Amino acid sequence: MDASAALSELFRVSTQVVEAVVTGPGGDVEAARTSSDARAQALAGVGAEVLSRVAGMRAGEPVERVQVDLDGGSLVALTDGARTVVATTVARPTAALVAHDLRAALGRIEGGAR
């Protein structure tokens, strides 16, 4: 399945994800479900930055997921080492369920890390 189809499936099964973007190993947007291309690029950039900053605080330990809770929802960035999915959610999401849904979306993409 390609990244676009994986995002379509994510939105079919998840009621808590509002928007999402998948980036490839180089950080390029492979697929997005956002209001605009500019929003997709911004979301991808913020996700990469959050993962990078947290990884820098962990002394060499890999970081798979970061969740930032905001007033109106959350930002969740999750990586499998090859691709990254960054999503915004409804307010007070079920964190483990969102993480599961994002991990499953990455797992559906052909050529990704398993």
Positions of PLM-derived features:
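Non-catalytic interaction/Regulatory regions outside core domains
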Residues: 1-114
